[in-house]
Each structure stands twice: as C-alpha cells, then as structure tokens.
Amino acid sequence: MEQKGEAVSVEELEKEVEIMLEENQSNEERKVEYAFVLNDFFKQDFLDPEEVLDKNKGKAARETRVYVCLKLEYENNTFLIPLRRDLAGMPGHPLFQKACYPVPSENKPDAGLDFRKIIVVNEPSLYRIDEAKISAKQRNTMQDNFEVIKNLAIDYIDGFKKAARKNRQKREPLYKYSALNNFLEELGIK
C-alpha cells in the first residue's frame, strides 16, 4: 500500500519542472544590469552639460567619478538611470513620486534612482556592465521592484518627450533640470 506523498507520477514531475523553468526564465527576464559610465562619455559636447555632469565638481572630478546606473532598454535607446546617494531634497517635494525612486541603504538612507538625470548612451563603448558594489538592501530593492522602476522611468521619459515636442520641457518643473535635454535627437524630438 502506498502512503500519501511517497509516489510521484511522471506527469507531476514534468509539471513541477515546467513551473521551475518558467520561474527561472521570469527571473532572468527581470535581471537587473548595472552600468558604469566611462570617462569618454563626459568628453562629449552637451547642450546642457550641467544637467549631465556634477556641477558642484570640476571637469576633472566629473570625468573620474564612478557613476553607478541601472540600465534600461526602451525604444531602441539605452537609458542609464543614476543611483544617487542623496535625494534628501526630493522626498518631501510633490514631484518626488514622478522623478525619483527611493533605494535606501543603512549608510545612505536618502539614496535613490533619479529619473531627472537619466542619460542616453547608445554606444556600448561608453559604459560597461558590471556588478555594482552596493548594499544587499539596495540590490534587492532594485531587483524586486525592477518592473515598477522601469515603468516609472518610461513614464518619465514619455512625459519629457511630450513636453519637449511642445518645447515646454524647460518650463515644466518636472523636466526643467532633466539630463534628457541633451538627448533630443536620440529621443526623436529634433
């Protein structure tokens, strides 16, 4: 006499394997890629360089700083969303929900992804994909919420494009300081 749970049919095993493969595939699809912007990127001529570069630092410091970004592919462009350590001025502001995504760590409680500083880097030689040296908490936050982050970033990009087509992006508070002002051609605006 068989006891419950001892014998498993081939059909049950096949179904279990199929479920595991689907879960593995969906995890691979959600794989977060971290990109590091290389120095040559900052040597380009930008229309609005202050919004791409750290305006509080000199040119040499800007070119040597390591920018950890979350990579996003959308509409034949590669977007890099910078992980910034201090978004303290943003959380209380009403635009925070549309412009940033909090990714705090114990050492950096105000860290997050800043959609205002998204850059377009379609040339793979200007960035490298590598494992980011960030806290496990930050890594898990981005991995677990990648689809939400992706959708928020796409909403921001689409909103910017809509404003730019009307030549209003410099007047709308959400886009006034956007790094995307430097990538109008890549976005199909010009």
PLM regions with names:
Residues G5-T64:
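GIY-YIG nuclease catalytic motif and its immediate N-terminal context
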Residues V10-E29, P102-K190:
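C-terminal terminal-subdomain/extension
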Residues F36-L38, I81, I119-V121:
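Residues in well-ordered beta-strands of folded domains
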Residues G58-R62, E73-A111:
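Compact nucleic-acid interaction/catalytic patches
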Residues Y67-L70:
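Short beta-strand-centered aromatic/proline hotspots
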